[in-house]
Amino acid sequence: MSKPMDHVKRPMNAFMVWSRAQRRKMAQENPKMHNSEISKRLGAEWKLLTESEKRPFIDEAKRLRAMHMKEHPDYKYRPRRKPKTLMKKDKFAFPVAYNLGEHEALKVGGLPAGALTESLMSNPDKAAAAAAAAAARVFFNPSMSANPYSFFDLGSKMTELSPPSFSYASPLGYPTAATAFSGAVGGGAHTHTHSHPSPGNPGYMIPCNCAAWPSAGLQPPLAYILLPGMGKPQLEPYPAYAAAL
């Protein structure tokens, strides 16, 4: 490598002229003090000086500047800035799997996996829709995957249910007091001892001598699909009429 040209230093200003002797003195008095702390203290002391106390150093700085201009008439201040590392921003706001086209649920129309992946990577909206479709095929049965909105069409299902059929189940999946009481009276010989998970501490089981759980009280698992830009939905008690769908 070629040797760089001799660097021409900037002329000292009034503070640099004053702090040259003060820095040496403070460093001798505090040998363990860091240079940055010394500069901080010198700057605070320089601000406390009056204009008459600063005048000799200001005049000396002007003389040094005039001498510098004579010695280097073509001088121009060019600060040597450190190169900044360019941060690579993510192209997409959400991660897209590289092997998205290899999934059986995403193979459409006989397209090769590479072409499908490139088309999804070029269009984030299609990638999000494809990811949601794959998740629906995993969590739900094929009939619901073909028409995912049928699961949420509760208005049409409500008309099929008669008012007496609404047996409000417990949000925790336990049998209600009326169901347990009727089961105990109607079939007292069929009661058996079992245990429930504790609502306050899931690690413990609570023994119970109530009747067996009715089929209406069992709740199917509910899965949430989180897409980009959507927050986690608040969990609400699963209603009894939705469990009958």
UniProtKB/Swiss-Prot annotation:
SUPFAM superfamilies: HMG-box (SSF47095). GO terms for molecular function: DNA-binding transcription activator activity, RNA polymerase II-specific; RNA polymerase II cis-regulatory region sequence-specific DNA binding; sequence-specific DNA binding. It is found in: Nucleus. PROSITE patterns: HMG_BOX_2. Keywords: DNA-binding, Nucleus, Repressor, Transcription, Transcription regulation. Pfam families: HMG_box, SOXp. Residues 8-76 bind DNA. GO terms for cellular component: nucleus. GO terms for biological process: brain development; lens development in camera-type eye; negative regulation of DNA-templated transcription; negative regulation of transcription by RNA polymerase II; neuron differentiation; positive regulation of transcription by RNA polymerase II. Its main location: nucleus. It comes from the Eukaryota. Acts as a negative regulator of transcription. This is Transcription factor Sox-21-B. The gene is sox21b.
